[in-house]
């Protein structure tokens, strides 16, 4: 899909399709009014017939509109003008993408970017239009024998800007948003693959492929023998029951000053999670292929950053393993020693994500990081607390937490902060080791982060629990690509 920006009146566009908005009670948007005037009131006449009243999500195709140069016009209902906010804008952009893609038009000029959205400027609207369009048209068909392709898929979208002065900033917004979409697509593709394809070795191969594509990337892969030498007993306890060897994958991108400390991202990469000996219920266990979405998001961010050549130093670390039950698997009650030297009583082998993360969090001390952010589908408790709307955020550094919350609001990939109070640490006490790997049912998301916080004393750290946002279930089952937009906005802000 190609995107560009353009300034000009809708009636003068030689295109397969021009898209304009109509608000509730048939109120025309500014671009629609221009078309109406040029066509001698044809739009108003058609709307008065009752085919459309402007309700959000409605669409109406018009062909051969008088005194216009386009083949067809798509009217899109935007709802009440006073209520046209970020969710409404995102919703109508998605509607346009799907509707035009099915129409056979290969090109469209979209004037919805001219609509006023409360608190948002033109560049935000352009960026959102690019990413939402790409997300809406995403289709995972790699494993299907027959592809369900559109006969004439949409190839180009031209986004309207108010004036010629907005063209250069608009093109830059398109460039950045396109790179984010490329990274998000990689994240979704990796997460949607089944565990018999996407195992730890496959993730390592994908990192090496990124290195080939982007010459500025360095990649290092630690094998189990390397991790054994480093004392990563927690991480290795997870892969013990699997025939698939664990991998610790590091990607380095140096686009900033040589003396600038890097941002470090750490992704949980459990490529399939049966729960181990603490076996999960069979229902919906297939969705545990998504337990590597944190790792997939790290790889997606690395790709997006390299694609746009962002002036920042960034390290991505993927802790990859498969959690399976067999005769060699870790048992409930086993005690292991982490890379930090702290001992852990594993009361539940299904709380394995924190075990791979804690050793990775110790490992990243060697990079002398500015900040460390881990991303993990860590707890079902986060879904109970926040549902499927917000990423859970916990941090030992308030400014970092605020920066991430702000980036979430900017990108509309939102997060919500939960407390990391010392009182919750009491739930992790063990009679047989320095700590237990679970803290009971109460505050499960918080106690999981409390566990991780014991391995992050030497740097500023934030934890993103994406269990509720990384994938969808049901009819639309599949990975969402979150929180790539949040992380990219954070990095863009930091690099500016």
Swiss-Prot record:
Query: PANTHER family from the entry?
Result: CYTOSOL AMINOPEPTIDASE (PTHR11963:SF23), LEUCINE AMINOPEPTIDASE-RELATED (PTHR11963)
Q: Does the keyword Protease apply?
A: yes
Q: Which residues bind Mn(2+) 2?
A: 268, 273, 291, 352
Q: What does this protein do?
A: Presumably involved in the processing and regular turnover of intracellular proteins. Catalyzes the removal of unsubstituted N-terminal amino acids from various peptides.
Report if keyword Metal-binding is assigned: yes
Name the major location. cytoplasm
Q: How is the cofactor bound?
A: Binds 2 manganese ions per subunit.
Q: Which reaction(s) are listed as its catalytic activity?
A: Release of an N-terminal amino acid, Xaa-|-Yaa-, in which Xaa is preferably Leu, but may be other amino acids including Pro although not Arg or Lys, and Yaa may be Pro. Amino acid amides and methyl esters are also readily hydrolyzed, but rates on arylamides are exceedingly low; Release of an N-terminal amino acid, preferentially leucine, but not glutamic or aspartic acids
Q: Which InterPro entries match?
A: Leucine_aapep/pepB (IPR011356), Macro_dom-like (IPR043472), Peptidase_M17_C (IPR000819), Peptidase_M17_leu_NH2_pept (IPR023042), Peptidase_M17_N (IPR008283)
Q: Which GO terms describe its molecular function?
A: manganese ion binding; metalloaminopeptidase activity
- Give the record's family classification: Belongs to the peptidase M17 family.
Task: Fetch the Pfam families from UniProt.
Answer: Peptidase_M17, Peptidase_M17_N
Report the locations given in the UniProt record.
Cytoplasm
Q: PROSITE patterns attached here?
A: CYTOSOL_AP (PS00631)
* Cofactor(s) essential for the protein: Mn(2+)
Annotated binding of Mn(2+) 1, by residue = 273, 350, 352
The EC designation for this entry is 3.4.11.1, 3.4.11.10
> This protein is called what?
Probable cytosol aminopeptidase
GO CC list: cytoplasm
Task: Provide this UniProt record's keywords sorted from A to Z.
Answer: Aminopeptidase, Cytoplasm, Hydrolase, Manganese, Metal-binding, Protease
A GO BP term, please?
proteolysis
The positions flagged as active site in the entry are 280, 354
């Amino acid at each position: 899909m190609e995107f560009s920006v353009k300034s000009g009146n809708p009636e003068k566009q030689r295109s397969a399709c021009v898209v304009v908005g109509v608000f509730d009670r048939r109120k025309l948007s500014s671009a629609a009014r221009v078309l109406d005037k040029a066509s001698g009131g044809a739009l108003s006449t058609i709307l008065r017939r009752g085919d459309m009243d402007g309700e959000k999500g409605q669409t109406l195709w018009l062909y051969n509109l008088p005194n216009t140069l386009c083949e067809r016009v798509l009217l899109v209902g935007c709802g009440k003008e006073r209520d046209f906010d970020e969710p409404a804008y995102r919703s109508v952009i998605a509607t346009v993408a799907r509707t035009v893609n099915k129409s056979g038009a290969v090109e469209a000029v979209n004037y919805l970017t001219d609509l006023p959205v409360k608190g948002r400027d033109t560049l935000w609207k352009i960026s959102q239009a690019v990413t939402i369009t790409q997300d809406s048209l995403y289709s995972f068909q790699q494993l299907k024998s027959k592809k369900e392709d559109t006969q004439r898929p949409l190839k180009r979208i031209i986004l309207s800007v108010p004036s010629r002065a907005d063209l250069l900033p608009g093109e830059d917004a398109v460039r950045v948003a396109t790179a984010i979409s490329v990274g998000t697509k990689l994240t979704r593709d990796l997460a949607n693959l089944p565990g018999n394809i996407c195992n730890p070795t496959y993730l390592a191969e994908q990192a090496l492929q990124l290195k080939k594509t982007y010459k500025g990337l360095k990649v290092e892969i630690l094998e189990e023998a390397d991790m054994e030498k480093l004392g990563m007993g927690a991480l290795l306890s997870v892969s013990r029951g699997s025939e698939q060897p664990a991998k610790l994958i590091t990607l380095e991108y140096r686009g900033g000053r040589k003396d600038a400390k890097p941002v470090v991202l750490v992704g949980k990469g459990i490529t399939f999670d049966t729960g181990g000996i603490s076996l999960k219920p069979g229902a919906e266990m297939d969705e545990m292929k998504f337990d590597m979405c944190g790792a997939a998001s790290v790889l997606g961010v690395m790709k997006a950053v390299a694609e746009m050549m962002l002036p920042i130093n960034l390290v991505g670390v993927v802790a990859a393993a498969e959690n399976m039950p067999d005769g060699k698997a870790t048992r409930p009650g086993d005690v292991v020693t982490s890379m930090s030297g702290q001992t852990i009583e594993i009361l539940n082998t299904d709380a394995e994500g924190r075990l791979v993360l804690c050793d990775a969090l110790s490992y990243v001390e060697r990079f002398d990081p500015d900040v460390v952010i881990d991303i993990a589908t860590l707890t079902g408790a986060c879904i109970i607390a926040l549902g499927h709307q917000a990423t859970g955020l916990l941090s030992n550094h308030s400014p970092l937490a605020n920066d991430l919350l702000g980036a979430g609001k900017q990108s509309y990939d939102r997060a919500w902060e939960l407390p990391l109070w010392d009182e919750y640490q009491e739930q992790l006490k063990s009679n047989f080791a320095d700590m237990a790997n679970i803290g009971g049912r109460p505050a499960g998301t918080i106690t999981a982060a409390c566990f991780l916080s014991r391995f992050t004393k030497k740097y500023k750290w934030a934890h993103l629990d994406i269990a509720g946002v990384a994938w969808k279930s049901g009819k639309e089952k599949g990975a969402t690509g979150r929180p790539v937009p949040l992380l990219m906005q954070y990095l863009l802000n930091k690099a500016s």
